[in-house]
Every structure is written in structure tokens, then in C-alpha cells.
Amino acid sequence: MNYTQQLKQKDSEYVWHPFTQMGVYSKEEAIIIEKGKGSYLYDTNGNKYLDGYASLWVNVHGHNNKYLNKVIKKQLNKIAHSTLLGSSNIPSIELAEKLIEITPSNLRKVFYSDTGSASVEIAIKMAYQYWKNIDREKYAKKNKFITLNHGYHGDTIGAVSVGGIKTFHKIFKDLIFENIQVESPSFYRSNYDTENEMMTAILTNIEQILIERNDEIAGFILEPLIQGATGLFVHPKGFLKEVEKLCKKYDVLLICDEVAVGFGRTGKMFACNHEDVQPDIMCLGKAITGGYLPLAATLTSKKIYNAFLSDSHGVNTFFHGHTYTGNQIVCTVALENIRLYEKRKLLSHIETTSSTLEKQLHALKRHRNVGDVRGRGLMFGVELVTDKDSKTPLEIEKVERIVRNCKENGLMIRNLENVITFVPVLSMSNKEVKTMVRIFKKAVHNILDRKC
């Protein structure tokens, strides 16, 4: 038994993988990644793969980036960690200042955590307590959130409560709190004749809910522009701005979950920037450290922050925090990550590669099994169907065979049900983007076009 075989045996014996049916996984030939460089991952057998899912939508400047490596090593020579509870540290202060500089101008305070789910959990608790701190009696019933159907905000209980993907969430229905779910503005599978008709109907319904149940609603949480985990649903232009207007009109806090779509993924630094939206609370994660280490942040306004201030420790205090909140190493690499965006003019690069990806993928719409191609920036989904008229989702077995065929030919991508997602390393070159699509196109041909 060679080294790779030994590792696979131990992996199967000891490791429980996330969002994975282990009964299936244990029977498959697992790929064990040993190292990475640039847009590529390398396994223990020496095979290399284009990272077409940015190691779960997080990698920015490529793997094994010398600049990010350098700042981590430099910080390690100073200190690895000290608590942010009752004291502070240099990297957490400098990163907070930078985050305030690059996010919407109304956001003035940064609360750190370690995962996107945690940043959402914090946002929910922050919004809920905000109303209680202002006037507990007047806002006694403000404990619900408007959410979008098919939304995904993480896997902790609060985040699941504001989610809307049955596959992930239905098993926990007895544990979660009630939310007010509204229709997602996703046109491809809607029953509307036009996007405008769909958007008008959904916004009208949202406004009616805000009028009728205003005393219950603490906030409106959504993934701005693109709903990721449900299959990359892209919202119509103007939807986010209209939601912001309604939230302001009816005095409801707007929470934008930018964990997946933030840091250039949609072509602008943040998805909110596309429509000049200023949320009351913004959640950040994933790409915040360039794909190196776990860090998240929940940003909010002075108005909300001030509601938590008191001269007495036990009054209005936000009792939330994690052991490694504001850790020096992760804050250091996050700060360097943001500096590299600016130094390398990454948003301009994404504008070019995004155009290439969009053109390459839209060319596939001629295929009889490609029902829809949707996305923005470097975040696209290809929905596979049995035929274009019925829009019946392609059998999952065939979709998974396409994904496996891509891996066999040197491309790591993943599917969300019948949607193949393309969320590559943000610094991926134009040539690599074309290679990624070419491998996928070949896989589609191998699985769907060849007669057995």
C-alpha cells in the first residue's frame, strides 16, 4: 500500500466531511490535495487541477501566494494570538480601519468572528437586540426576519432559521425560529412572463408584509445580487435598491450577507456597490483572507452601535464573541489580501476574465441540455436540463458524472443539484478561464453526447 492509499484509508476511517454523504464518498476514489500554486491544486499522486471553485469560493490571489505567506511568517515572529476580550491588537485595528474604508460609507463598526455563518448569527442577534435596547416594551414583538425563499446564510441554527433551502434545512425545522419567507426574484423557473412583472409582484408582496407585520419584523436579510448555494440565482437589476428603499420607508434593518458575493466576486468590491446600497448590517467572510485562514466580520452603522452603549457593563452589552475573535494572524493576512486587490488592480483583471467566462459559457446555451447560464463577475452557474422546453432538471447521476469527468481531465468544479458552478480563483488568467470552460465542454460531450 503506497502513501496515497494509506491516506485514503485513514481519511475514510477517521474524517467526517462537511455536506457530504459519507456512504457515497467512502466508495469513491478520493482526491487528496497536497499543495497548491496559483490557480492549480496538486494531489498526492502529482496530478494537477485548475481550481474552478476557488476552494469553495474563497481563493483570491492564487494558492501559495508569496506576499500572503510573507506577512503570516512575519506576524508569527511577533505573536500568534491574544484575546480581543478586554484588550486589542494591532492587526485587528488596522484591518477594521481598512474594512471601513472600502465598504459602504454608513458602515462604521466592525465585529469579528471566524466563519460566514457566525457573521450572520451575529447580524441576527445584533438586529434583534438593537430594537430591545432602544425600547424593550415598544418593540417587544420585533423578533422575526424577512428572508428569501431558496436563501442560504450558513449552517448554524440562527443562520439556518433565515435560510430557505429544503435540502439543507428541513431536517432542523423543530430547532429553528420562524421567519417570514418571500419569493426569490429568480426568473428562469418563475411563472411570470417578464422580469419586470416578477419584480413588481414580489416587491408589492414585500411591501404588504412590511405594512401588515411591521411590529414583528426586526430585519430583512438577503444575499445581494446572487443567491449562491441555491444554484446562483441572479436578481434583476434594481431589486436590491428597491428592497433598501422599502426597508428605510418602514424602518426595518437591511442585512446584506456578502459572505459569498463580497470581495470582487461579482465584479465590484461588494455586490451592494452595483446599486449603491448602504445596508444597516453587512456580513463578510470567505475571500476576506484571500482563501488562507478562517475570518469573518459583521459591519454596522454608528446608529446601531450606539444603541449598545452604556456606562454599566451589564446594560445593553452585546454578549457575543469567539475565542479567536480578531486573531492577529488572520487579520494580518486579510489586510495584506485587501492591499493586493489594490496593488494588482484585481477588479480590472476580473472585468476582463469575467467577460471571457460569460462569453464562453453563453456559447454553450446552444446545447440541448443547457437550460440557463446565469451569473455576474466570476460567479456563474450552468443549469442542466433534460430538455429546454420542460426545464426538467437533468438526472443528478449524469450531473455528477460530468463533475467527475472534469476532475479526470484536470478541473475541480462542483455542482449544486443540476447546476454546475463556476466560481474560480479570482486571479485566474484569461487563458486558464478558457481552459476551464473547454474541459467542462468536453465533459458535457463525453457524458451527454456520446452513445453508449
Swiss-Prot record:
GO terms for biological process: biotin biosynthetic process. The gene is bioA. The modification N6-(pyridoxal phosphate)lysine is found at residue 286. Catalyzes the transfer of the alpha-amino group from S-adenosyl-L-methionine (SAM) to 7-keto-8-aminopelargonic acid (KAPA) to form 7,8-diaminopelargonic acid (DAPA). It is the only aminotransferase known to utilize SAM as an amino donor. Its main location: cytoplasm. Homodimer. It is found in: Cytoplasm. Substrate binds at residues 152, 286, 321, 414. The record marks 19 as: Participates in the substrate recognition with KAPA and in a stacking interaction with the adenine ring of SAM. It catalyses: (8S)-8-amino-7-oxononanoate + S-adenosyl-L-methionine = S-adenosyl-4-methylsulfanyl-2-oxobutanoate + (7R,8S)-7,8-diammoniononanoate. Belongs to the class-III pyridoxal-phosphate-dependent aminotransferase family. BioA subfamily. PANTHER family: ADENOSYLMETHIONINE-8-AMINO-7-OXONONANOATE AMINOTRANSFERASE. This is Adenosylmethionine-8-amino-7-oxononanoate aminotransferase. One of its GO terms (cellular component) is cytoplasm. Its cofactor is pyridoxal 5'-phosphate. GO terms for molecular function: adenosylmethionine-8-amino-7-oxononanoate transaminase activity; pyridoxal phosphate binding. Pathway: Cofactor biosynthesis; biotin biosynthesis; 7,8-diaminononanoate from 8-amino-7-oxononanoate (SAM route): step 1/1.
